[in-house]
Amino acid sequence: MAKYVPDIKTQRWVIIAATRTKRPSDEQKTKDNEQKAESNNQKIAIPAGKQESGHACPFCSGNESMTPPEVYRIGSGGPNETGWDVRVVPNLYPITDIHEVIIHSPSDTDDIEEMSLDQVTKIFTTYRDRYRANQDSGQVMIFCNHGLGAGASLKHPHSQLVVVPNQINLDAVEMEPMNNIIEEHVNFISYCPDFSQWPFEVWIAPKVKGKRFGEVTDEELPDLAGVVQDALKKINTALSDPMNAAFNREEHFIYNYYIYHGKNWFLRIIPRSIHRAGFELGTGLSVNIMDPTMAAEWLKRGKLA
């Protein structure tokens, strides 16, 4: 069971989840294999269904027996068999008592910005359905850590769903005004809020306010999938521009995104292009080296005017 420790003065909380130290790490496995290969003067071959580490990937099709029994799937085939398009399983190393892994596709390498719109729509359909299934149990947080530098322990593209008890106060940013608009779709708007804490941070929000994420309709899901995919493509292009060499590109496009858990929901994309240092950690203040107005213009036009 998760252990919650409060700070009485600020009503902020810490979750003690010691089992998380047991998570498998592709980064460490890859380093170990590279060292072995170098010592033997060999190249690493990557068989199907395995990561760069050379170890079997539990999220690849054909390796369903390596995960706990699934709780949801989109696609053909029976439970815990091949044929799925999106698959959801309990997390073996949970943060809280309800913690699920949403596997984006059978592919080990396809990222959201590279998938078909139909596949991305299936991912967001899964988000919506799992939100609905868990909303009576607490505050539902859906998030994606893309890349090892963004907190992912396994490279196979996936998201996570965590349920936090209602009595725990979440220190989460709420909806920001829709300034610096990038693009307007049928049901959603993408923008860079004035309160952007990260360079090229993008928010996506529904035009209709006052709703929770679980209220997104089947008709709205393809539009949402499209605006998120488009935003990720634009951010990646901007960060790849030589004029933005100041941003960290040690690893191919790393980012986090999450869906706000309560009313007036939004999706927030945070490119991890800079590192937080002592000043930010010590003061709680964020330093953004890219003006949100300029970021929105860049993302809208593909360059500064």
Language-model segments: residues:
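Active-site microenvironments that recognize anionic phosphate/pyrophosphate groups
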Residues: 1-156, 162-212, 216-219, 232-235, ...
